[in-house]
Amino acid sequence: MIQKETDLMVADNSGAKRVRCIHVLGGTGRRYATIGDMIVVSVKSAIPGGAVKKKDVSKAVVVRTKKEYRRKDGSYIRFDENAVVLLNTQGEPRGTRIFGPVARELRDKQYMKIISLAPEVI
């Protein structure tokens, strides 16, 4: 579960390393985001010469959460870290590579570009 002020890792090569959630998209007063949900983030640390800089505000999709996620078949999935992939204004990934596994729930939410770039879909 991701909420405002949550620090997250960035799972792509857009140049950002750590971001902080500043808003959860999807309705008035929505408090939590989980796998596949879109959030607004602020870049807290970035690599020099990257496409994004510190203090940049961007949209992102959550690809991994520490909090377990219950699937329709009754199984649970959880990861070791909270991670996002930064998106451009068209909703496509800003980076050209994705690091680490992503959940297959992204396929249901039509993030096919992220699924195709990911090294492993769990």
From Swiss-Prot:
GO biological process: translation
Record PROSITE patterns: RIBOSOMAL_L14
UniProt-listed InterPro entries: Ribosomal_uL14, Ribosomal_uL14_bac-type, Ribosomal_uL14_CS, Ribosomal_uL14_sf
GO molecular function, one term: structural constituent of ribosome
SUPFAM superfamilies registered for this protein in UniProt: Ribosomal protein L14
UniProt GO cellular component terms: cytosolic large ribosomal subunit
The UniProt record lists the keyword Repressor: no
Top-rank lineage group of the source organism: Bacteria
Keywords: Ribonucleoprotein, Ribosomal protein, RNA-binding, rRNA-binding
Described purpose of this protein according to its UniProt entry: Binds to 23S rRNA. Forms part of two intersubunit bridges in the 70S ribosome.
HAMAP family from the UniProt entry: Ribosomal_uL14
Family: Belongs to the universal ribosomal protein uL14 family.
Assembly description: Part of the 50S ribosomal subunit. Forms a cluster with proteins L3 and L19. In the 70S ribosome, L14 and L19 interact and together make contacts with the 16S rRNA in bridges B5 and B8.
Name the UniProt record assigns to this protein: Large ribosomal subunit protein uL14
Organism: Chloroherpeton thalassium (strain ATCC 35110 / GB-78)
Organism classification: Bacteria, Pseudomonadati, Chlorobiota, Chlorobiia, Chlorobiales
